[in-house]
Amino acid sequence: MTRIKNNGISKKKRKRKISKMKGWVGGHSKLFRTGNQQLMKARHYAFYDRKKKKNLNKTLWITRINGGLKYYLTINEKYNIFVSFLRKTKTYVNKKLLSEINVRDSKSFSHLSKPIMKSTGINL
């Protein structure tokens, strides 16, 4: 059987991975096998949490819009009813923009919301 010499390539690969493990506790930063397992786990969580962050932001935006409806319009309308009114009046504004308007400029949020609610028959 022939001898395969790729020691230099393997060392480079290990060095590259170990350099990404700096600052970790215990053998995770020194030993290749345990560190590699932690690196794979860290990459998995990084991917998963990038997806999770989007969902958390959406829930934050919906909560802000719902709070703005209750505070500025003094009605107990829910977010989903408000969104259905937006669709009926063909006002296309995304969740992020609505929540930013609510946080930064509350008067314009109420000016945006009142005509929509009046056009659907809700008295304010």
Curated annotation (Swiss-Prot):
GO terms for molecular function: rRNA binding; structural constituent of ribosome. Its main location: plastid. Binds directly to 23S ribosomal RNA and is necessary for the in vitro assembly process of the 50S ribosomal subunit. It is not involved in the protein synthesizing functions of that subunit. GO terms for biological process: ribosomal large subunit assembly; translation. This is Large ribosomal subunit protein bL20c. GO terms for cellular component: chloroplast; ribonucleoprotein complex; ribosome. It is found in: Plastid, Chloroplast. It comes from Euglena gracilis. InterPro entries: Ribosomal_bL20 (IPR005813), RIBOSOMAL_L20_CS (IPR049946), Ribosomal_protein_bL20_C (IPR035566). Coiled coil: none annotated. It holds the Pfam family Ribosomal_L20. The gene is rpl20. PANTHER family: 39S RIBOSOMAL PROTEIN L20.
